[in-house]
Amino acid sequence: MCIRDRAFEILSLYIDDIPAADLRALVRKTYTAEVFGTEAIVPLRGLEDGLYLEALSNGPTLAFKDMAMQLLGNLFEYTLAKQHAELNIFGATSGDTGSAAEYAMRGKKGIRVFMLSPHKKMSAFQTAQMFSLQDPNIFNIAVEGVFDDCQDMVKAVSNDHGFKQKQKILSLIHI
């Protein structure tokens, strides 16, 4: 069974508010060679008899988190379109999860991402990956301080329920 079929079978056990045909289409849209660099999506390589290595880092940010985030971006876009709604995602990151979230949400209609990260506290690769992403709905914000300072800002917004509702904010605390 290919990864697309397996993902659909598992997701369909838990997602009952998206028609099966639509869910299958979203899974097929997500797990493509164009996104993951290979038709196998998660290639399995035999190292020796009975020992295999599965590659989970073929996505756009080279992080295993792309496996879930890419699907999440498509699910968000689908759901928001059905509801004629918009969403502002406000998060904090110290590395690859922020990049995976941004690359998953780039170009998605009705979604904007505001991602805080500690200024000069991430690897050069992670900083370049995030801050070179040019997309009108992705906003990278470098914060003087450490990751905990970024997280504190997200928690403050998360705890202001009136503000979150008015601004249509989904806050992501542990990225």
Model regions and ranges:
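N-terminal entrance/gating region of PLP-dependent enzymes' catalytic architecture
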Residues: 4-62
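Small/polar-residue-rich loop-to-helix segments that shape phosphate-bearing ligand pockets
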Residues: 116-173
